[in-house]
């Protein structure tokens, strides 16, 4: 009876140890952090109509902040989620002579991400993409000023949802084993049933990732 108990305990121990080793082979760690970005927002299509009759499609520099979290699986696969916010102000758009200060296009989006990463000594190049959705808020002030408390007579405020596919490539630079500087370039491909500006264009991200 004692031998049977020992055999059962040994078998259970071996099973748990094997499962642990197998899990370790699959799970290679995790990472997460924040990234700032700058990019260019293309207006598409050009049919946002103001009360004055003009059709506009603002384009210009956009900037913002966000972050991502990933689980590292097997040798190369990383999966996780991300979320970002980005703002284009009228002063850095091609409509700065037409739109008043205070006009902006603000975009927020988030989704799931997956990429392939090659863990070299100091450099970890990666390529992948994300899929998700978001919303874009557009404020176009044609007459008036943001410096007073008067009601604006000619302005448009609009909010629209969208879905997106976002291919990207980049690399991590291993500052230490736990801390990586990350650099990423992507191009958001947005789609929506509505006929206003879509948040389409390239962005360059720079940030810090904490790895475990």
Q: Where are the regions that the model predicts?
A:
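Residues that define the transmembrane beta-barrel architecture of outer-membrane proteins
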Residues: 28-30, 59-65, 104-110, 123, ...
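Extracellular loop and loop/strand-boundary signature of outer-membrane beta-barrel proteins
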Residues: 48-55, 95-103, 150-157, 190-195
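Predominantly the C-terminal beta-signal and adjacent terminal strand-loop region
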Residues: 88, 165-212
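Short glycine/proline- and aromatic-enriched beta-strand/turn motifs that initiate or cap beta-hairpins
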Residues: 19-74, 211-212
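Gram-negative (and chloroplast) outer-membrane scaffold detector with strong preference
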Residues: 71-149, 173-175, 210-212
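Flexible, solvent-exposed coil segments and beta strand-coil junctions
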Residues: 41-49, 87-96, 144-152, 182-188
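Transmembrane beta-strands of outer-membrane beta-barrel proteins
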Residues: 28-36, 77-81, 110-112, 125-131, ...
